[in-house]
Amino acid sequence: IFQFDMWGVEPSDKYDWKSLADKIMKNGIRNSLLLAPMPTASTSQILGNNECFEPITSNIYSRSTLAGEFIIANKHLMKDLIKLNMWNEDVKNNIIANKGSIQQITSIPEHIRNKYKIVWEIPMKHIIDMAADRGAFICQSQSLNLWQEDPTYNSLTSMHFYGWKKGLKTGIYYLRRKAKHQAQQFTIGPEKKEEECVMCSA
């Protein structure tokens, strides 16, 4: 019996599951549990990838790990904008000013904005649904992080029960929330201003 059998899921015929089952019944298996997808922050960021199966948290941000501090840009977004001849200093600064989101940058085509939504712009129901789709092929469990800008007792209860009804073994690993007060964007603003003469302004 495979994991997907216990979930009542019929897999595609891409792989020969019958032959694998026959080999296991004949020869046994070394480990009873094989899969447990987990966050891999340091290695993921160093190699330019996002953590595990998580949605991206920002299209441009700095990341501190045990290995040091790194400036991270969404390389896939950059590639798409370069193809459209749209990647430039102004766009980069606008993304920073919008806290890593591109949803308010209307010069970027809608299909690109839809493709690169950050985690705060994605319904958690979709994240839980995708976790359930993976769950049928994960024998142990998965480290599922969820995000809510302003979590409440009702929203958390609803989220937990939805995941439970979908059959998730781990309801939640970390709950991420936004800080009540956002840090001031000292480094960049949506528009650059000419520097004024300090002596002249007296």
Please state what every model-predicted region is.
Residues 194:
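Residues immediately within or flanking Cys/His clusters that coordinate Zn2+
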Residues 198:
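Cys/His/Pro-rich metal-binding microdomains
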Residues 1-23:
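Short glycine-cluster motifs
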Residues 11-14, 23-30, 35-191, 201-202:
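Catalytic alpha/beta core of large soluble enzyme barrels
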